Amino acid sequence: KGLYSSFNSMNMFEINHSLLRQFGPENWTLYKGKHLLCFVDNHDVTRVASILTNENHLPLIYALLFGMPGIPCVYYGSEWGAKADKSQGDPALRPSFKEPEFNELSEFISKLADIKKNSKALNYGDFTSTVLTNKQCVFRRSTGDETVYVAINADDQEYTAYFGAEKNQVTDLLSGAIINLDGGLKMAPYSAYFLA
């Protein structure tokens, strides 16, 4: 619930609080070092494409899912934005699809999965929040030899994030773009970045 609720209420503090409580840098956190299954929807709840109030947030919620600690799970059909409400009953939530519908969302999730699969930091790294506003969050996932910053802008306006990265020039793993951080990270409206 914290994932979609943070986007619907434009309150990134909600999901950040949960992630810090579960995986933060303190020794008392609940699941530090654990690899929990994480999802935005499943066979028993309203599909995330139906529950988000702004469709521009759909790719962003998956970016957050694949960037945060845990093992991301994508419920079949949700990778292309299938919709269904829990009030419609189980058959609506668990349909038989004739064939997959490849689209921008499924391509984006495929990129996220590839990035996650190939990143030690995203699979085993610690979690540190570096920038947090109601509509933006940047967090660091880091192991001894790799660091990835995950940056989300859920707003319809550009935002510049300053977060003290270890190096001034980074690569966005999603786009392949080389980004100079001297003036901060200029985040486009409704955007996500995985910076290494």
Regions found by a protein language model. Give the residues of each.
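Short glycine/proline- and charge-enriched loop/turn segments
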Residues: K1-G2, S87-K98, S175-G176
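Conserved alpha/beta catalytic core and glycan-binding cleft of carbohydrate-active enzymes
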Residues: K1-Q88, F127, N134, R141-T143, ...
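Aromatic- and carboxylate-lined catalytic core of secreted/periplasmic carbohydrate-active enzymes
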Residues: G24, L93-T130
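Ser/Thr- and Asn-enriched, surface-exposed coil loops between beta-strands
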Residues: V131-K135, L181-G183
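Solvent-exposed beta-strand/loop surfaces of large extracellular or lumenal domains
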Residues: T171-L185
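C-terminal beta-strand-rich structural cap/linker in extracellular carbohydrate-active enzymes
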Residues: L181-A196
